[in-house]
Amino acid sequence: SIRWALLASQSIGKSTSTNLLRSDDVLNTLNCLKKLGVKIYLFKNKCEIYGTGINGYKYKKNIVLNAGNSGTLARLIMGLLVHSKNKIKIIGDKSLSKRDFLRVTKPLEKFGAKFKTNFGKLPVVIKGTKNPIPVKYKENKGSAQCKSAVMLAALNTKGKTIIKAKKSRNHSELLFKHLGIPIKIINTKKYDLIKIDGKKKIKSFNYKIPSDISSAAFFIVLTALSKNSKLNIKN
């Protein structure tokens, strides 16, 4: 859901999703995008996002984006802000503020953006560059978040960004392909080689977000631990 919202914000026109997860992390994502000038309408059965296009965010100076408890949101949105005209501060809750962010700010700095951290942690202040440059990045930790942040930065960067990433979740790659974003992926046993041509327009799109079994994991474990309990998981 977070990835859909971020990519929809980069498209041109109205994108619609159904089955959007209504969690705090996703709602914080929508709130952050609204602060960046994206129009969003949340209905009972769908969500509409009116994308601003590549490099199209419009916002006031020195805004603060609150990622709450979402490391996915905090790291991925940094990738979309490597071209930000004004300084943007990203904050989070007490738990998120204890986590390391250098592993994502370091590769994003290669695009030309500047990051100021609190000893590697939140808050993070971003000062983007008008002309981000394509990079070659090797990701050795198997972090889907770091890989995705660089992929999103590549969207706003003219030229070809090349990522050699240790095997990890491929949600971002699947969405890129679905949207027709110029991406080439070469799979090997341990690594994926990802090539992205940036600065290409993204058309608005309709998307039914797949259900995520991890959201049901808590109830599955609780049922397994409780005698005479039954759980029916649908969709």
Where are these regions (language model features)?
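Structural preference for solvent-exposed beta-strand-turn elements
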Residues: S1-N235
